[in-house]
């Protein structure tokens, strides 16, 4: 890995973590979409999409599935390797979704802001997955209510949440509120990056939040 690639990756990741509004996210990912898979996912040995995908399939997740914060489709690719399920993608960045569409794994793409409500009817999806969206500078715990709104009765959601982000924003409090509505929730900790990652963040972890309606 060249020093130039390492430096560029580090700068972009820190910028992503420091975003403060939906508008910031749209602007930032507009300029990173075409290079994201190589510049970040490849260089960082980003295995979180694989972690989410394997958990979803292990728990017998079914379609149709909505990939929330789908980005360039890395999670969708991992799911498609394990099972052929109908998948839709949603992201705040149209440019990221355009890259995802080229992979041919989603039958529908929806540009939308999870924090403001998605243009989707209640109880639409049997499965909802998300990798890397609930993290610094992106989406907080309040968005879990929107996730549960569009999850069908008997459905399954598997969402990754950066572990530091979880504790700093109080995901536990929202999770307790969701449990009071009858949702079953489980949390496991996984690595975000693989053994090839050499960045300062190489040991960062995420919680896989599993919600059963």
What is each residue range found by the language model?
Residues 154-162:
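Conserved beta-strand signature within the Rossmann-like core of class I S-adenosyl-L-methionine
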Residues 1-22:
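N-terminal auxiliary segments of SAM/dcSAM-dependent transferases
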Residues 37-53:
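Conserved SAM-binding loop and adjacent beta-strand
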Residues 169-190:
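Conserved Class I S-adenosyl-L-methionine
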Residues 118-128:
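A short acidic, Gly/Pro-enriched loop at the edge of an enzyme's catalytic core
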Residues 142-153:
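A short glycine-rich, Lys/Arg-flanked "PGG" loop and its adjoining helix->strand segment in the class I
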Residues 66-117:
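Class I SAM-dependent methyltransferase SAM/SAH-binding core
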Residues 183-213:
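Class I S-adenosyl-L-methionine
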């Amino acid at each position: 890995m060249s020093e130039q690639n390492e430096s560029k990756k580090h700068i972009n990741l820190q910028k992503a973590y420091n975003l403060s509004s939906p508008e910031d996210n749209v602007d930032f990912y507009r300029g990173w979409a075409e290079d994201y898979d190589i510049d970040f996912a490849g260089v960082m040995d980003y295995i979180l999409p694989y972690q989410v995908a394997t958990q979803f399939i292990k728990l017998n997740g079914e379609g149709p599935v909505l990939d929330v914060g789908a980005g360039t489709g890395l999670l969708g690719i991992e799911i498609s390797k394990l099972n052929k399920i109908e998948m839709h993608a949603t992201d705040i960045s149209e440019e990221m979704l355009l890259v995802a569409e080229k992979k041919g794994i989603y039958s529908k793409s929806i540009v939308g802001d999870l924090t403001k409500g998605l243009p989707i009817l209640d109880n639409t999806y049997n499965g909802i997955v998300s990798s890397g969206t609930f993290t610094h500078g992106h989406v907080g715990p309040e968005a879990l209510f929107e996730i549960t709104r569009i999850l069908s009765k008997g459905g399954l959601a598997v969402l990754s949440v950066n572990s530091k982000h979880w504790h700093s924003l109080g995901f536990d409090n929202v999770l307790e509120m969701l449990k009071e509505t009858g949702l079953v929730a489980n949390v496991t900790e996984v690595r975000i990056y693989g053994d090839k990652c050499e960045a300062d963040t190489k040991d960062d972890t995420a919680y896989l939040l599993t919600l059963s309606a």
